[in-house]
Amino acid sequence: MKNRLNVLLFLLILSTGLYLTRSFWQGWIVGAFSVLITITVVFIGIVIFLENRHPTKTLTWLMVLAVFPVVGFIFYLMFGQNHRKSKTFMKKALSDEEAFEKIEGNRQLNEEQLQKMGGHQQLLFRLAHRLANNPISFSTNTKVLTDGKETFAHIKQALRMATHHIHLEYYIVRDDEIGQEIKEILMQKAKEGIHVRFLYDGVGSWKLSKSYIQDLKQAGVEIVPFAPVKLPFINHTINYRNHRKIIVIDGTVGFVGGLNIGDEYLGKDPYFGFWRDTHLYVRGEAVRTLQLIFLRDWAHETGETILKPSYLSPALTNMKDDGGVQMIASGPDTRWEINKKLFFSMITSAKKSIWITSPYFIPDEDILSALKIAALSGIDVRILVPNRPDKRIVFHASRSYFPELLEAGVKVYEYTRGFLHSKIIIVDNEIASIGTSNMDMRSFHLNFEVNAFLYRTKSVTTLVSDFVYDLEHTNQIRFEQFRNRAWYYRVLESTCRLLSPLL
């Protein structure tokens, strides 16, 4: 109630101030415009207030509207509206339920297998099942791929071996060397009669050439943009982007992780140099869930529902048990902020260690508090971030969180070998998450994401080893040294942090 009163008081002061300043302006046009702006700002402020957002985000938007009323109003229409609880994604939510009915048998949690887990591990996977309805598989093999060279070598080989269908879903696709290689393989497979479907994000891949798309279409590839933006008409859902990176081949082989399709992911960009990223190669039952995630997104964009047995039939269910694997999709089409809640559960259930790798580290208050409490409780909390920016505002906003984390005992490291783009969480060396979700508010609240949650698989052991190896190529940030950094860095970081609820 106190927060709401503060917001209402802010709106009252803002409205009064803007109205009084109108008397100092010259001309009735300017006066009328000021009244219009006042009414608009107050109206939008009331709308934001009634949405019951987090107070920090509410006040940030009000500040933007107050300082930059015209630009702030436009930005709010483009990026500020909350559609999670609206009917914007209703069609997609309905298709989810229809799709899950097709694999009901595989949705049931394997109680016998779950009993082998520890208590807090059981709670995590049950929570994931409740939030996302996705099953856990104990008949899936996974392999960690640690850079672009290894990842694209596996992807190209798997694509060439396809016999029935290829499904791709990517945030960024570039018409460069690796993009051309992937295109040529897809065109060849389509000409062989393989059904190829390609879903790319309309904003992330806005530079993708028309000739690239046309070549694929002429070869028989079905390629569709996700939520395309057609200037000058900007859709109000422009801020909700498909950040997923999924490949499914013949329903039995899948890929998921942090790498998009572009030469920079192979370390060919001179600014970034070596690109440290992580992808997951998947074979077996859990591929069905990746398939389902793709088919739901495809149905949402095209209206074409492809829930056939040839796509959703059991995939290599006789594979040797290699621990539990659970594919989880999250996004604004879900009732809950799934990835955030699962990350929070992982952090709060940790007994020994929490190791996080994230290129964009902008936690909300819940995650930030959980990390500090864990460190203060004696848990080994380590966070690995890049030491060079690709998004400068995000980079400096991220650094503003370091002092309070360091003071609580969290160890923060900056990766120095190249650019770090992996999105990993490892808890107690037993449970891990690998996928597309960053530890930031955009991934929590706005983007469509997908993550693989792993329990006691060989891949968890690999991720632990990779994290230890990556630490050899870092500089550890020390609290005393960092808090004595130049004042202008502190001002810059604090300013960027003010915008963090909007990033």
Curated annotation (Swiss-Prot):
Membrane topology, from the record: Multi-pass membrane protein
Ribonucleoprotein recorded as keyword: no
GO MF term set: cardiolipin synthase activity
Any single GO BP term: cardiolipin biosynthetic process
Main location (coarse class): membrane
Keyword Cell division belongs to the record: no
A Gene Ontology term for the protein's cellular component: plasma membrane
CDD domains tied to this protein: PLDc_CLS_1, PLDc_CLS_2
Active site residues per record: H243, K245, D250, H421, K423, D428
E.C. number: 2.7.8.-
SUPFAM superfamilies according to UniProt: Phospholipase D/nuclease (SSF56024)
NCBIfam families: bac_cardiolipin
Functional summary from the UniProt entry: Catalyzes the reversible phosphatidyl group transfer from one phosphatidylglycerol molecule to another to form cardiolipin (CL) (diphosphatidylglycerol) and glycerol.
Family in the record: Belongs to the phospholipase D family. Cardiolipin synthase subfamily.
Name of the protein this chain belongs to: Cardiolipin synthase
UniProt source species: Halalkalibacterium halodurans (strain ATCC BAA-125 / DSM 18197 / FERM 7344 / JCM 9153 / C-125) (Bacillus halodurans)
